Amino acid sequence: MVGKSVVLFVLAAVLEIGGAWLVWQGLREQRGWLWAGAGVIALGAYGFVAAFQPDANFGRVLAAYGGVFIAGSLLWGMIADGFRPDRWDVAGAAVALVGVGLIMYAPR
């Protein structure tokens, strides 16, 4: 169950962060509406992925995904835009990922 959940979180992050990045590129970097449109499609697809999480609680899944989004956004920025996080960015992402583990995978 944990493996499936992690894969779904990674897929959700790629779709949401990638979609937002495509919209940003289309509008802010003036790459055009095709980029922005592709981003909107990716963002829409992200909305479906959370529904496949093994945990049935929407609030828990989306709260935990927030931590994945934090770390994933920093990683995306590093890969796609050459962003270099400082130690506080890394520390914050680590705290967020610990939160993901507690929220999603702590024994209940």
Swiss-Prot record:
InterPro entries: UPF0060
Bilayer topology term: Multi-pass membrane protein
Keywords: Cell membrane, Membrane, Transmembrane, Transmembrane helix
Localization terms from the record: Cell membrane
Main location: membrane
Transmembrane segments: 6-26, 32-52, 61-81, 87-107
GO CC terms of this entry: plasma membrane
Region forming the signal peptide: none
Family of the protein in this entry: Belongs to the UPF0060 family.
Name of the featured protein: UPF0060 membrane protein MSMEG_3252/MSMEI_3169
Species the sequence originates in: Mycolicibacterium smegmatis (strain ATCC 700084 / mc(2)155)
Lineage: Bacteria, Bacillati, Actinomycetota, Actinomycetes, Mycobacteriales
